[in-house]
């Protein structure tokens, strides 16, 4: 074979390999863009991933509202490995099981949200699916151009990530996990693990919960907690109008803000961050332990020093006192 023939063969092989690579990458991008969740769980890419290679196929069914529901008889943990993903989950009315629905799913940087049939997060009432509804008419030129731009951008990020790996400086895109709970249900045995995201719990009662948020923001609004552990690493935790009963709220390096009532002995704390707590009424005989570590503690807008016998005004008729026991600040309302 002469040099020209060899060169021609090499060129053909290179073009073929490049075409196959482009088809693979573009196919992966389109799979993400379609939001094809059922294929996403069982795709060869997921099966090759070492973290999921041993997991069985998850059995699902579709309810009347179009939600993909997890079969409660198979409570395997599901990992959504994607980014800019907005997940809406509710309890399916048919089998009282967990449902999930990916509303938006594109492929920037990897992020894992762990879901299992005992995990219900966010808000009571109706579904909070936040997806843009397409216009009744055909899309205009501008919308078509935006769609093409988004497709090319997702394809580029897929190509960049698959070829060069995640070590080349991808920025983390925060996401928000949205999970719905019917108004008549409370949440028991809640287990949540989130990373680089914003997690909100609103207007629900959680019991026996274990929530861990890494480099994330945790917001609780009108939540009643009973024997619950909420822990964040770098992010901030906000607990507004919360009712604590045997609850433990921690943040390693962030800011922990709390205002609400106590219905059981509870603990809030930080290692090197800041604790801001506010109470307005007498909370019976229940006490709140504050672990401040090397951080700062503010109660009712006053800096609390680690001294004995500190009492603060609540703005009402009650008085709030802080007791130091071996470095732990115990907040209580004296009888």
Swiss-Prot record:
Keywords: Cell membrane, Lipoprotein, Membrane, Palmitate, Signal. The keyword Metal-binding does not apply. Residues 1-21 form the signal peptide. Coiled coil: none annotated. The keyword Membrane applies. It comes from the Bacteria. A lipid is attached at residue 22 (S-diacylglycerol cysteine). InterPro entries: Toastrack_DUF4097 (IPR025164). It is a lipid-anchor. GO terms for cellular component: plasma membrane. This is Uncharacterized lipoprotein TP_0839. A lipid is attached at residue 22 (N-palmitoyl cysteine).
């Amino acid at each position: 074979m002469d040099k020209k023939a060899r060169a021609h063969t090499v060129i053909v092989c290179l073009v073929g390999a490049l075409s196959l690579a482009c088809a693979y990458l573009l196919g992966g991008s389109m799979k993400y863009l379609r939001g094809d969740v059922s294929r996403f769980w069982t795709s060869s890419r997921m099966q090759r991933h070492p973290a999921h290679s041993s997991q069985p196929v998850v059995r699902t069914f579709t309810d009347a509202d179009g939600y993909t529901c997890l079969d409660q008889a198979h409570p395997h943990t599901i990992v959504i490995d994607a980014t800019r993903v907005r997940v809406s989950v509710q309890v399916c009315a048919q089998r009282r099981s967990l449902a999930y629905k990916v509303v938006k799913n594109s492929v920037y940087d990897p992020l894992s949200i762990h879901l299992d049939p005992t995990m219900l997060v966010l808000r009571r009432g109706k579904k909070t699916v936040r997806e843009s509804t397409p216009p009744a008419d055909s899309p205009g030129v501008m919308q078509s151009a935006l769609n093409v731009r988004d497709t090319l951008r997702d394809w580029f990020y897929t190509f960049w990530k698959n070829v060069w790996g995640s070590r080349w400086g991808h920025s983390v895109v925060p996401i928000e996990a949205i999970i719905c709970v019917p108004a008549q249900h409370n949440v028991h045995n809640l287990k949540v693990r989130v990373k680089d995201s914003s997690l909100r719990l609103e207007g629900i009662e959680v019991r026996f919960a274990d929530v861990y948020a890494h480099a994330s923001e945790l917001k609780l609004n009108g939540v009643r907690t009973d024997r619950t552990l909420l822990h964040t690493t770098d992010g901030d935790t906000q607990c507004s109008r919360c009712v604590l009963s045997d609850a433990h709220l921690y943040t390693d390096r962030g800011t922990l803000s709390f205002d609400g009532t106590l219905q059981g002995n509870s603990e809030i704390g930080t290692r090197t961050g800041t604790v801001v707590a506010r109470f307005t009424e007498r909370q019976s005989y229940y006490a709140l332990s504050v672990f401040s570590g090397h951080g700062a503690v503010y109660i009712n807008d006053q800096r609390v020093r680690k001294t004995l016998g500190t009492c603060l005004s609540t703005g009402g008729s009650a008085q709030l006192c802080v007791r130091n026991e071996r470095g732990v600040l115990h907040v209580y309302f004296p009888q």
